[in-house]
């Protein structure tokens, strides 16, 4: 009874609307940060935003934390609303599935643009992984990253334009179902804004003698797997299995139970890898 009551209360929460509010906060604060960011001197400009631009550190923190909240609330929204996704056509569901890795790439490129020890390492690892993908790897790297040749210029455009437009195109049909009044979600917005006042967004300078650098929290499992498997398997094939399985996560397919089991095993394995990376 207690579990059923908890589930009922969770379903009553408008997780989708909450995530949309966080998306709005992320977009507004991101525009303000982007105005002062210089791809030619990424780490210097990030530091200058924190130290020299009036309220710069606050808006960078708000952009960072509202983006993280957007991802987390979207995941919760997906889990809670999943039983209702059977009404979606394969095309509608497929677009939302593709929107998920695009969302992760948006957050990931945000980490890379900091160009601190975490961002620089993450960027070069991503570039190396893409270059191992047969046929299309070099083209994808040239379109999304190309850090070795162009520094942060390509990543900057990818983060503020390319991925945003792709994600909006994929999710627009779903987003327009929601009509939110920002005034109804002032407590959530207030928490995000207040949290950003007291907790600054991370910025990790280079430290001599440090041999292990943790990447973004949502990619820690992949980072750990790269220690044991080739980049093409750990960085491309392994996550591709999860995305492909999601495509068939609708009850209309006869192998729904098998896909559900595969996803559960994948997530459990990824959780173990993430914990290993956290305690390394």
Give the location of each predicted region.
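Membrane-embedded alpha-helical bundles that constitute the cytochrome b-like, heme-associated redox core
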Residues: 1-280
């Amino acid at each position: 009874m207690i579990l059923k009551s908890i589930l009922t209360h969770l379903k009553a929460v408008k997780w989708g609307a909450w995530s949309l509010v966080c998306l709005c906060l992320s977009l507004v604060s991101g525009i303000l940060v982007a105005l002062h960011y210089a791809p030619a001197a990424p780490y210097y400009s990030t530091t200058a935003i924190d130290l020299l631009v009036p309220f710069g550190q606050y808006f960078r923190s708000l952009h960072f934390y509202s983006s993280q909240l957007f991802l987390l609330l979207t995941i919760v929204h997906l889990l809670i609303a999943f039983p209702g996704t059977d009404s979606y056509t394969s095309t509608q569901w497929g677009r939302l599935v593709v929107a998920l890795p695009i969302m992760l790439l948006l957050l990931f490129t945000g980490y890379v643009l900091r160009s601190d020890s975490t961002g620089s390492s993450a960027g070069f690892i991503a570039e190396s992984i893409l270059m191992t993908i047969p046929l299309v790897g070099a083209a994808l790297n040239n379109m999304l990253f190309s850090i070795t040749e162009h520094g942060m210029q390509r990543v900057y455009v990818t983060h503020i334009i390319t991925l945003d437009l792709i994600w909006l195109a994929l999710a627009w049909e779903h987003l327009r179902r929601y009509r939110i009044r920002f005034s109804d979600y002032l407590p959530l917005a207030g928490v995000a804004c207040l949290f950003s006042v007291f907790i600054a967004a991370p910025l990790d300078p280079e430290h001599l003698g440090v041999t292990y650098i943790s990447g973004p929290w949502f990619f820690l499992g992949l980072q750990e797997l790269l220690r044991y498997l080739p980049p093409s398997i750990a960085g491309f094939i392994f996550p591709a299995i999860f995305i492909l399985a999601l495509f068939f996560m609708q009850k209309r397919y006869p192998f729904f139970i098998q896909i559900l089991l595969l996803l559960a095993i994948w997530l459990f394995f990824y959780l173990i890898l993430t914990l290993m990376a956290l305690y390394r």
